[in-house]
Every structure is written in structure tokens, then in C-alpha cells.
Amino acid sequence: MFLKKYLPAIPVIIILAMMIFTDSCANTTTPPSGGPKDTIPPVITKIEPLPGSINVPRHKTKLLLQFNEYVTIKDPKSLFLSPPLEKAPKYKLQGKGVLITFECDLDSAKTYTLDVTNAIGDNNEGNMFPGYTLVFSTGDRIDSMMVTGTVQDCNTLKPLKGATVMLYKDHADSALFLRRPDAAVKTDEWGYFCIRNIQDTVYRLYAIIDENNNNIYESETEKVAFFDTLITPVVKVNDTLPELQKYDMKDTASCLARKSEYELNIFKEKPTKQLIVNKERIGERTAYITFMAPYAQIDSIWIKGVPSDQLITQFNIMQDSLEIWVNDPKEQPDTFFLNVNYMKTDSLGLLNSFTEEIKLVKPKKSLAAKSSKKDMKKEDTLCVFTIDAKPETVEQYGFVFEFKYPLVEDAFDSLTFRYVNPKQQEYTEKYSIVQDSLNLRKYVLRPNVEMLPGYEYFVKVPHRKFKDINGFYNDSTEVKVTLPNDDKLSTLSLNLINVNNKYIVDLLNEKRDKIMRSYVIDKDSTLPFPYLKSGKYSIRITEDVNRNGVVDTGNLLEHKQPEKVLFYKLEDGTVLINIPEMTELEQNIDLAEMFK
């Protein structure tokens, strides 16, 4: 009965047929040929102890999986025992089988599952065994409940393969940091998990990216997810359930047909320990320091021998990285002694004022330049900058100037902005310049005229209009951009209603790895997405609850989930919007309904 219930069907007929029709080596009169390539994966022929066995010995436990051909272990980490022990299972190839042993005793009266999905392949062609989960107990019964769900990245909402999903009967969050779970499993390529043969009791549900495979959460280096409330299994194990089958991950229909009870969004917590973790002098007058935790609190900062009014500093948006420049064109010493007075975490885990001296040595390239000028490039004596102006988005983002070093002199009013219409008529127009609030080296030029498709726009920068901290002036340049005028391009308009918070709205490409256009809104709005090529796109909307312009992460001990990120779903449940050529689409989105 146990064999029928727990052991997958073995294609005996196929094996017998292969044996009957295989030519005998003794009777052949011609040399053997290569023959067709073997594409059939290994098949289990024997399991010890039998699936569903009870009262399995705790001490020196051995499990044997016998196959119809010689096999090898492709990925030892995929031999996963639940509940996990302090040390991972050991394996040994034994004939056509795999012998699995454990370095420590199993617990008494406990149901175990050994999953071997993506672990075993045949010895010759590498055909992968589709997977199997062996269930056994050291007690006199087999636990019979199960839970299912999916794990995804909190920002991209892409499924995460290989996350460790954990169940704890200890409901204190500290358990995740201190001991291994009462049951666990790894997610597949769809981010899907099924923790089977567990007790009928109340659990905490977590997932982690277990970097060191110790089945314990380490917040400084690993990502985590948690379900907001306690859970109780409601589904009993039945080997006919789709959720318990082993599917080819390319079988989309079957994989999507599996029911998912819980959804976990995995995130990286902010480090709680504050200290300087990295520092580097990257140029004659440039250096940076980085902190372990965001929002570093700096009281004062100085470099020995450098007047305070010559020091320029800038934090990044998360305030965990600080750029430092010395505003002095003369040659600087080979070593800077940077002093930073900041709030540092002490041995008791408390923040205290601390002054740290950091030695910053000039990079070798700069030292070599002292004795040799022959390799000096033109850009090494110029005020270097770029102008970013993409045809598809320039009317929204403007012409973005970014300088390599901070400016000490500028004459933005000396620039020329002109445009040529389709009739080849040329006009000069006024413009505005705004310095970026987060990057003092970035400036945005916006014309005082609406930018139109098919028009050519020019920004001309004359010679010696900008001077940086090195004392270098700029070279002259001109950029040209033409707004797209292709009749085949399409437009998507989003009508967003019931906007009761601040939201970040992104249009992404099909792979979700490129933002086509982005908006930040805090009221009902109509957002245009013009100049779209035919293809599939998705709409990602992030709820910026604290209105800081950043997608804030979660906090496990505070039971705070990361700020919610959702993809707009069509009526059929898909997130991809198919946009044909020469189309104007309009979509209404009720944000209050979407984020309720």
C-alpha cells in the first residue's frame, strides 16, 4: 500500500522492451555503432526504506535510491532534507544507486522528506532525473498536511528560484535568527513551493535567500520574506494533486495550474549596524566613503591641511555613500588624511559619536602622471561632461548635463537652444536650467516651447563656459535630437483615478529589465507614454507611503513589509499589454481599488 501511494509509476514495459529488443553483443558480427543519442532520463527501480515507511532508525540512517542506469549527482545542494539538520545530507554513488547518509542522528517521532529535484542525472548524456520526494518517519505515523505558495522579488515581482521557504512552530521572529525550521523546501524556477507532510498545527511562514546554506537567517547578508499572520495548513497530502507532481519547468500550463495559497515578497533589510565599510581615493581631488547602513549621521568631516571651505561633499539618496571633492586646482598630496566624526555602532549595539581617521592614497595612475605627460589624453585637461537627450523621452526629462567634477564657474546663459521645423524653418528659443537636487554635478535644460514630433532640436555649448574644480574649462560641443515621427509608433495613455497617496508609475519592456518612461504622481492624472514600438509592455506601480521618492524596504522584527509594488493586470490576469503598430490605447486604473 505504501509503495503504491508514495512511489511514482515506473515504466516497466519500456524497460522490458529495451531489454528484449537490444542486440546481444555475443551475437553481433559487426562493430557497434554510435546509435541515436540517449534522451531518456534515469528511472527509479528501488527505494530503501520504502516510501511512507515508519519507525525508521534515527541513528546512522541510510537512504538508497536505485536507478535503471548509472547516475551522477549534478547538484549536491539539491539533496534537501526537511526538517533540515545542522549538516547537509552526504551522498555516495553505489553501483546504479545513490546512498544518502547523515552525519548526525535524526529526531525521534518526526516525519522527514528528502527532495532530490534537479540533483541527479544519468552518467553519460546528463539527462536529468525529473525529481522525487521521499517521505518517511522516525515515529509511528506520517504527518499529512501541506502548504503551497510562491516567492517573488519585492521590486520586480519576478519569481525567485532556490529560495528556502521555512515553517516555524515557534512564533517569535527571533527563532528565524537562532535555529533551523520545523519544515522547509526550496522554490522551483516559477518561485513555487510545496511543503508537504507537515503537522496540523499553527506556523510562522518565512522565506530566505540562504547564501551559506545553514538554514538560519543572517540579516546582514541575506534577503527575507514573511507572511503577516500565523498560518494553519488546510490541505491534506494526496499524491494525485497537481501541486505534488514533478513537472518540466518548460511546461507552462501545468506549472501555472498549481494552486498557490501564500505569496511572499522577498526583500533585503536595512543593516542595523553603522560603520564605514569602504573608502577609496579615485582621483587627484576625488574620494568616497560608504557606510554599512543608510542615513549615516555625520557631525563633521575634514581633511588635514585642506581648508574647510575647499571641501565639497555629497550624499547619495540613501545617505550611505558620500562623495568628497577638494576644490583646489593645485597638485594635491599623495595621501589624504580624512577625519569623519559620525554616529557609529559600538560593541553594545548602540550609536555613539566617534571620530575615525581614514588614509586615502592617490591612485597609481595619478602618481604615474607626475613623471610622464606623454600618455595624457585631451579629456585629462578639459572640463568633461555629457548631455543625455533621448528622442523618445527628451520632452519629459529635458537635456540632462552631467559633469565629471563639480563646477566652480558656469555660464549656462551663454548656451544656444534652437530648433528646425519640418519646413526647414529655424528658430531660437529661450530655456531654463535647474540643478538636480540630489546630484550637484547634474543640470537639466528645458526649452520654453513645446517639443513636437519631427522637429530637430539643437543645444550648443560654446568653448570655456564651464570650469571645474581641477581648473579645467570645457570644449565646445553641440547635440541634436529629433523627436520620433514614425507613423508605425503607438501611444498608451493611463487615466489614474482615486490617487490618495504618492505613487511611482513605470512602463517596462517585456523582460521588465528596462524602464521606458516613469512618472511620480500624488493626484488623479492622465499619463502619456508616446513613441512606443509594437510589442509587449507592463505597468509597474509603486506605493510611496512615506513620500520620500524611494522604494523603502521592509523590516522583519517590526513586521513591516516593503512598500507595495504591483503590476497592473488585465481582465485575463496577465500583466503584459500587447501594443500593436499605429495604435492609440487608453487604460483606466483605479489605484484605490488596486492597492486596497
Question: What is the meaning of each model-derived region?
Answer:
Residues 2-596:
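N-terminal targeting or signal-anchor segments and their processing/structural boundaries
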